[in-house]
Amino acid sequence: MAARPGPLWLLGLTLCALGGGGPGLRPPPGCPQRRLGARERRDVQREILAVLGLPGRPRPRAPPAASRLPASAPLFMLDLYHAMAGDDDEDGAPAEQRLGRADLVMSFVNMVERDRALGHQEPHWKEFRFDLTQIPAGEAVTAAEFRIYKVPSIHLLNRTLHVSMFQVVQEQSNRESDLFFLDLQTLRAGDEGWLVLDVTAASDCWLLKRHKDLGLRLYVETEDGHSVDPGLAGLLGQRAPRSQQPFVVTFFRASPSPIRTPRAVRPLRRRQPKKSNELPQANRLPGIFDDVRGSHGRQVCRRHELYVSFQDLGWLDWVIAPQGYSAYYCEGECSFPLDSCMNATNHAILQSLVHLMKPNAVPKACCAPTKLSATSVLYYDSSNNVILRKHRNMVVKACGCH
C-alpha cells in the first residue's frame, strides 16, 4: 500500500517518463519510459503549477536569448539559487541564514530612470522606479536591497564619497520632493563592484501602495558635502551593459497563520518527555508470530524514483533552473514483522499486529514519506521579474511504515 503526499504524487510514474528529453537531462536509471499524450501533459502541467503555487503558466513578454542569463538581476538570482540548492543538498543552514530565511526572493529591474545631473541646479541625484505590482499578498518582507554597479571614477581621483539612498514619499511641484532616508554607504572614488544599499524600510510602503511607487533617489557627496553627479562618481544606470544594470532584490517569508490556543478544562499537568519512535533493532515479537511472512514477491517499503522534467513539459522559456529534479515517492509492503529498515512507528507495528488477527477489520500499515525536503525553482514571471521560490516538502528523503 503506498501513500503520496499532495497532488504531485497523484501523477505517479508518468512524470518519471518525462525525463528523457535531451542531453544531460535523462532521468535516473530505473525510470519507466512513456510519453504522455496532449491531454495528459496538460493535466500534469496543471497539477505541477498548483503545487508551485502559480495560478497559471507565466508568459514573459520577451523570452530570453539562448544564453538565458544575460542581465544583472538573473545572474544574481542564479547565484542565490545555487546557494539555496547547495544548502538543501547538505541539509545545513548557512545559505538559508544568508538569505534571511526567505521562502521567496523577487528581483525588480529598473523601469524608469531620471537624473538631475550636470547643467542642473544642485544637489545632483539619480532616481529609479520599479514595477512592484507583482509583489505577492500574504508575504512578509524580511529584507530588501538596491544594487548598483560602480566603476572607478577618473574625475574624482581617489576621494572618499558618501552615497545615500532615499525613498520618494511625495512629489512637490514648487520645491524638493518629500524624502525618507533609507541607507548611507561610504566608499572610495576608485572602487569597482556592486554597491548594496539597504531599502528594507521602504517595503511597508510597497506592500500598501503597489501601484503608487514614487521610486528611490540616490545622492552622492564628497567628504566636504559637495554634491556629485552619480554618473561622474562611476555609478551606472540604465545605459550600462545588461550585466551591470541596477535592480532591487526583495526577500519574503510567508506570514505564519495565527495558531488558536485550545482552552483547558482542567489544570495542565507536566508532561513527560516524549520517547523516540525510532527503534534500534528489528521489530520482532517472539513466539507465535515467528513464522509469519509478508506477501511473497513484494518489495518492502522503500523510496522509488520520480523525476519531473521542466524541459519536456515545455517550460524552459520561463523556468531558469532547474531543468528537472527528482521528487521520489514511497511504495512497498508493510507486512509484519516490520524490520528496522522500514522506519516503522510504534503505531504501525501495533496496526500490523492487529491486521494479522483481523485482516478484514484493520488494514495494513501504509508506506509513506518520513522525511521531506524543499526544492527551489528560479523562473521569470509574466512581467519579466525573476523569482526564486523555495517549495517545502517537495522531495522525499526517506520512507517508512505508518
Swiss-Prot record:
Signal sequence span is 1-19
Which Gene3D superfamilies does the UniProt entry name for this protein? 2.60.120.970, Cystine-knot cytokines (2.10.90.10)
Biological process (GO), any one: negative regulation of insulin secretion
PROSITE patterns tied to this protein: TGF_BETA_1, TGF_BETA_2
Pfam families recorded: TGF_beta, TGFb_propeptide
Q: Which GO terms describe its cellular component?
A: extracellular space
Q: State which residues form the propeptide.
A: 20-263
| Keywords for the protein's UniProt record, in alphabetical order | Chondrogenesis, Cytokine, Developmental protein, Differentiation, Disulfide bond, Glycoprotein, Growth factor, Osteogenesis, Secreted, Signal
> What CDD domains does this protein's entry cite?
TGF_beta_BMP8
Q: Which residues are glycosylated?
A: 158, 343
Residues that span the membrane, as ranges: none
Q: Which GO terms describe its molecular function?
A: cytokine activity; growth factor activity
Statement: the UniProt record of this protein carries the keyword Glycoprotein: yes
UniProt-annotated location(s): Secreted
Which family, according to UniProt? Belongs to the TGF-beta family.
**Functional summary from the UniProt entry:** Induces cartilage and bone formation. May be the osteoinductive factor responsible for the phenomenon of epithelial osteogenesis. Plays a role in calcium regulation and bone homeostasis. Signaling protein involved in regulation of thermogenesis and energy balance. Proposed to increase the peripheral response of brown adipose tissue (BAT) to adrenergic stimulation while acting centrally in the hypothalamus to increase sympathetic output to BAT. Growth factor of the TGF-beta superfamily that plays important role in various biological processes, including spermatogenesis, osteogenesis, steroidogenesis as well as regulation of energy balance. Initiates the canonical BMP signaling cascade by associating with type I receptor BMPR1A and type II receptor BMPR2. Once all three components are bound together in a complex at the cell surface, BMPR2 phosphorylates and activates BMPR1A. In turn, BMPR1A propagates signal by phosphorylating SMAD1/5/8 that travel to the nucleus and act as activators and repressors of transcription of target genes.
The protein's name is Bone morphogenetic protein 8A
Which organism was this protein described from?
Answer: Homo sapiens
Q: Which gene encodes it?
A: BMP8A
